[in-house]
Amino acid sequence: MTTVSQDRLEKEAQTTNRLDVTAHGRIREGKLEGFKRQAAELIRQTKEKDTKTLRYDWFISSDGTEFEVLEAYVNSEGLIEHSMHIGEARNVLFSEFADDHRITVHGDPSPQLVELVNTHAPGGAGGVKWYSFLEGLDS
């Protein structure tokens, strides 16, 4: 994200098909500290490598058993790029520290993103819920 300004990304997202993503999951018992370290690694890689990521914020439930990640991308290409950059670190997260991974995507994905999800997402397309934009304050 260091090569493109945040203002430029926001403007591009307004004229393209921005995607907002929420990832949900469960932290394995006794694995909270390892989970936090791996989440920090995912954030580090995202900061260093991604060019079309607008948001990538991690949250943990008050009892330390669940997490959510709020994500936003300029477009489908941004989410594809992000997935390629963090693939190995994400695999470590879910093989060692977390499970029950579910994803919600708000926005209209490109065919390339749908193909990627069908082949690589946990549970395939069944682990992802897609919601198309209907109407809002800026529409």
Give a label for each model feature:
Residues 1-67, 74-85, 96-139:
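Short S/T/G/P-rich N-terminal loop/turn motif that feeds into the first structured element of a domain
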Residues 91-95:
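Amphipathic alpha-helical coiled-coil segments
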